[in-house]
Amino acid sequence: MDVMRSVLGMVVLLTIAFLLSVNKKKISLRTVGAALVLQVVIGGIMLWLPPGRWVAEKVAFGVHKVMAYSDAGSAFIFGSLVGPKMDTLFDGAGFIFGFRVLPAIIFVTALVSILYYIGVMGILIRILGGIFQKALNISKIESFVAVTTIFLGQNEIPAIVKPFIDRLNRNELFTAICSGMASIAGSTMIGYAALGVPVEYLLAASLMAIPGGILFARLLSPATESSQVSFNNLSFTETPPKSIIEAAATGAMTGLKIAAGVATVVMAFVAIIALINGIIGGVGGWFGFEHASLESILGYLLAPLAWVMGVDWSDANLAGSLIGQKLAINEFVAYLNFSPYLQTAGTLDAKTVAIISFALCGFANFGSIGVVVGAFSAVAPHRAPEIAQLGLRALAAATLSNLMSATIAGFFIGLA
């Protein structure tokens, strides 16, 4: 029954995407079918097949080791505020977001910059990009951008495509925006992991977002023009660093900007949510609903969707609330509110944890529309009106991609 419900959830999400398509007659069944199959296959390999699960666990172990090295840098600056004594001192509540999550973002961004400098990222992107381009029958630039999102976030995508943005057709531009929204950056992945989100789920979600973003981008905005961009004129950065030290320093400064942005937005939105909840609770109290909140309203509205994705009805309100928070606010706030349930064993079953972890794993939220429009318009001011028109539709495609990954994850966890 649970497995069939997951299948129903996939059908519902695909139906929603089909209904939102701007040109239903131009939908390529070859690309859409291949993307769906690839998204399912990646999920199956990493969540169900023993060899794939073994690899995911080993990579997750490696990520945790990297986080430990990040803590070494944090401890140098903040001392014992990062150490295990904090948990003892505060009875298990010694995890401080600003001392653990934000420094990890800075460290990983610097590390990624070094890997770009020595050519590792370039090789991975070209190999994976070529594979996805052939498998999905998409343009080279679409596969390039989609694969790049494993390592870079939506803020960095405009810089990646700047050298050839004038040659991107409307569909390729839409796909680039969708891919950025549907994914997470490698640096922020560490931040989510630090909150207790299973790393193997984050890794699987990041890989599944590649075909998932393409799938829903091509459903909502089918390709109607041929590509004018080739791999021969692709570049990873406009001004590459001249040394590995410069690469590390530049990456660290970029990480600082990302960390500062995360801290600023999370702090502001947590406070805004508290204000909204105070207002809702106050008004609700007049009618006997003094415990009403934004989270509870979103939970009721999205609970049916969470249920059809595979979440048990007893947890559907919570799942719907977190998905709503991610969409209305951002994924960091949603993961932050999800974190307490991860810290207490047995609070949620494994399938629910997986579905929520996958559903929240992406930049798709209303605030991202402003980020994308601003970032892409900065590198292509003359295309700003076109980019603004694509924003809301791209958000829908990216959200559906995240929910599809979550539904697929629930399907395979249910089989295990």
From Swiss-Prot:
Q: Which residues lie on this side of the membrane: Cytoplasmic?
A: 24-31, 119-172, 218-246, 374-394
Segments crossing the lipid bilayer: 3-23, 32-52, 96-118, 173-193, 197-217, 247-267, 353-373, 395-415
GO annotation, cellular component aspect: plasma membrane
Using the UniProt record, give the first listed, main subcellular location: membrane
Keywords carried by this UniProt record: Cell inner membrane, Cell membrane, Membrane, Transmembrane, Transmembrane helix, Transport
- Residues on the membrane's Periplasmic side span 1-2, 53-95, 194-196, 268-352, 416
- Give any Pfam family that matches: Nucleos_tra2_C
Membrane topology term: Multi-pass membrane protein
Highest taxon in the source lineage:
Bacteria
GO terms in the biological process aspect are:
nucleoside transmembrane transport
Gene Ontology molecular function terms on file: nucleoside transmembrane transporter activity; symporter activity
Q: Does the keyword Membrane apply?
A: yes
The places in or outside the cell where this protein is found are: Cell inner membrane
List the InterPro entries: C_nuclsd_transpt, C_nuclsd_transpt_met_bac, CNT_C_dom, CNT_N_dom, Gate_dom
Q: Which family does it belong to?
A: Belongs to the concentrative nucleoside transporter (CNT) (TC 2.A.41) family.
Which PANTHER family does the entry link to?
SODIUM/NUCLEOSIDE COTRANSPORTER, SOLUTE CARRIER FAMILY 28 MEMBER 3
Protein name in the entry: Putative nucleoside permease NupX
The species this protein belongs to is Escherichia coli (strain K12)
